[in-house]
Regions:
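N-terminal Rossmann-like NAD(P)+-binding subdomain of aldehyde/semialdehyde dehydrogenases
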Residues: 1-105, 132
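Short, well-ordered beta-strand elements within core beta-sheets of diverse protein domains
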Residues: 13-19, 259-261, 317-326, 341-346
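Flexible, glycine/charged-enriched surface loops at secondary-structure junctions
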Residues: 22-26, 90, 166-173, 248-255, ...
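Rossmann-like NAD(P) dinucleotide-binding subdomain of oxidoreductase/dehydrogenase enzymes
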Residues: 85, 93-236
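ALDH superfamily catalytic-core signature
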Residues: 120-139, 158, 162-165, 205-317, ...
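C-terminal core of ALDH-fold dehydrogenases
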Residues: 328, 333-429
Length: 430
């Protein structure tokens, strides 16, 4: 099918999905999870083809993003079941107003309609996005990167089998066969056919959507995430958090990319950092972190001299930009200049410094004494997320079910007319 045909088919799925009750949607998600596991062999074979084709062209870290395993497939099915267990967002009354004239006005959550997701080489996004869209009563159109197409196609075939078993339209979940820039542009300009576009990818993709999209678009920005170690930090805690934020999974958007350290503790902290992230990892046979150091940090430990652009780089790799700052205000200013407004953390025992940091850092998630790696729908108790929004309107931070709905006002009356016989009951007359 062409992109236009897929878009038209998705429009036809809007009404059945909008009318589906929670039990129907939950049964569909369970059937999709069962079908996903049943198709494990086919999905893993397809994934191996993707890995074979990508090997030598992308880094080992990016290959890890692309790779599927039986354990990861089990986690994907578990994620779908977790979405099924969440309350149905559709039909929730967000606000109720009873007017003096007897009108009952309810601000009610309703499905978005058709949600398009452009993403790159993370096949697990396929099942996450489909589960969230179905539970939120919307059809979803998926456009993955070419490196992951075989994997995503096999996953979507399984999900559509689950939809058929649950008697919901299989076109509620569709994958574009075209992975070119042209297909992405087609989604960006599909006015009247796409109700919401969510790009999940690198800076180039996000910029293209912001500049070219004529349909509503939510930015799920790149993650230049910062950790600031304050002079009042517990330095052992700080090393633990920095290690986790950088090395637990460096290829994801909530991984730390820049470390800022207060000048008063730099001489004590940097040797601890190097021992843990560089020497200790090398001794354990793990990839050491390449430290890109500003001049003050380089005077204390060895590393790579930091270039100015390093502090604006999302490495998605075992690399970390490091700078020394004078105080918490200097850290806040550095973050304001270089942040992508995703996730930032302060490590401190000083409540005043923590309050200043959380009030002044303008990012979707701001942590005190915790790793930025918690910026995730599941970790927030929202279920799997469609992405992490770095903008301020409609959605900000991990986008769960509530953020995938819009709302309408439903008004119940008993014959009221404006300026008519009931006007004397109203608190407003023209």
């Amino acid at each position: 099918m062409t992109t236009q045909e897929i878009l038209q088919a998705a429009q036809g799925a809007k009404m059945p999905l909008a009318l589906a009750d929670a039990d129907t949607k939950n049964a569909a998600l369970e059937a999709m999870a069962v079908a996903l596991i049943a198709a494990s062999d086919k999905i893993l074979e397809a994934n191996q083809r993707d890995l074979d084709a990508a090997r030598g062209r992308v880094s080992d870290v990016m290959l890890d993003r692309l790779a599927l395993t039986p354990s990861r497939l089990t986690d994907m099915a578990k994620g779908m079941r977790e979405v099924a267990a969440l309350p149905d967002p559709v039909g929730a009354v967000l606000r109720k107003i009873v007017r003096p004239n007897g009108l009952i006005i309810e601000k009610t959550a309703v499905p978005m309609g058709v949600i398009a997701i452009i993403y790159e080489s993370r096949p697990n996004v396929t099942s996450d996005a489909a589960a969230l869209a179905i539970k939120a009563g919307s059809a979803c159109i998926l456009r993955c990167g070419r490196d992951a197409w075989a994997s995503c196609h096999a996953i979507v075939e399984a999900l559509r089998a689950g939809l058929r078993k649950a008697r919901l339209p299989e076109c509620a979940v569709s994958l574009l066969s075209d992975t070119s820039h042209a297909s992405a542009n087609e989604l960006m300009t599909a006015d009247g056919l796409v109700d919401l576009l969510i790009p999940r990818g690198g800076a180039g993709l996000i910029r293209a959507c912001v500049e070219n999209a004529t349909v509503p678009c939510i930015q799920t920005g790149t993650g230049i995430c910062h950790v600031y170690v304050d002079k009042a930090a517990d330095l052992e805690m700080a090393v633990d958090i920095v290690e986790n934020a950088k090395t637990s999974r460096p290829s994801v958007c909530n991984a730390e990319e820049t470390l800022l350290v207060h000048k008063d503790v730099a001489a004590q902290f940097f040797p601890m950092l190097k021992t843990r992230l560089v020497d200790g990892r090398a001794a354990a046979g793990l990839t050491p972190v390449e430290l890109h150091l500003d001049t003050q940090a380089a005077a204390i430990i060895d590393g790579v001299p930091a270039a100015p652009q390093d502090f604006d780089t999302e490495y998605l790799d075992y690399k970390l930009s490091v700078a020394v700052v004078d105080d918490v205000d200097a850290a806040i200013l550095h973050i304001a200049r270089h942040s992508t407004h995703h996730s930032e953390a302060i490590i401190t025992a000083d409540a005043e410094a923590a309050a200043r940091f959380t009030a002044c850092v303008d990012s979707a998630a701001v942590y005190v004494n915790a790793s930025t790696r918690f910026s995730d729908g599941g970790e927030f108790g929202l279920g799997c997320e469609m992405g992490i929004s770095t903008q301020k309107l409609h959605a900000r931070g991990p986008m769960g079910l509530a953020e995938l709905c819009t709302y309408k006002y439903i008004i119940h009356g008993s014959g009221q007319t404006r300026g008519g016989s009931s006007a004397k009951m109203s608190c407003y007359t023209k």
